[in-house]
Amino acid sequence: MAQARRLVLFWYRAYNQMMTDFNAKTRLFVDMPLVAQQRVTLPDAHRHYLVNVMRLAVGAPLTMFNGHDGEWAGHIAEISKKQCAVDISMQIKSQINCLDLWLLFAPVKKARLDFMAQKASELGVSCIWPVRTDYCRISRVKDERLAANAIEAAEQTERMDIAAIREFTGLFSVLDQMENDRLLIWCDESSAGSPAHNIAVALRAAPAHYKAAILIGPEGGFSPSERKQLTGRKNCLKISLGMRILRADTAAISALACY
């Protein structure tokens, strides 16, 4: 009888811990395998975030995802000066990936670039690709900064995959690498095409596609040679974002929201 009582108490406590883990408010991206009933040791950066920023202690619940295995519930099992260990209890969500949608853009200044990467990730792009155009004023882009913004946005919005970050590349090279069946949505600031409220209509009239890329140009627009290349490209849809010339970050959000 005593043994049965202890067994019931054990499962009762285990069930309560699982329910606590399931209702966790802290969500963390980790670059490691996630398996039920396993203990994982987090990198020091994660330990610092959980302990010093979030002020979590041993026993605190959290959820984790790695971008391809769904979402998992767990709790902090151990904290030391050098590491933080988490016990994984169970998978609570199956993996769901966003649409195969790329954002190609001429980079802008740092603060607006951070904003663009965050919002693009929140809106579900699968790839963030800064492109070098003839009139681009930025000469260098920090890939790791874009990646950090994409991860933070995914953590906050319950997205389960992470937008891929591609290296800063010339526009013509990007176009050469793009598949022919990927619809290129060219946001042309000088276009006399669809006004802002008809972008969705223009997209519905576009060729059938299951993957696409949205192209946003620099503040100075596209050069004549770039326009010639884009105009002659197969499977390219030129659209207007309205009567006004939008900043690159505003244009990106507008186009993504309409897709």
Where are the regions a protein language model picked out?
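N-terminal positively charged helical leader segments and presequences
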Residues: 3-93
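A mid-sequence, solvent-exposed acidic-amphipathic segment
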Residues: 171-207
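A C-terminal functional module that forms or caps the active site or interfaces directly
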Residues: 212-229
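Short, ordered loop/turn segments at secondary-structure junctions
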Residues: 33, 91, 133-136, 243-244
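RNA substrate-binding interface of SAM-dependent RNA methyltransferases
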Residues: 93-186
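Short, acidic/turn-prone active-site loops that include or flank metal/cofactor-
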Residues: 191, 219, 243-246
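Structured adenosyl-cofactor binding patch, chiefly the S-adenosyl-L-methionine
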Residues: 224-259
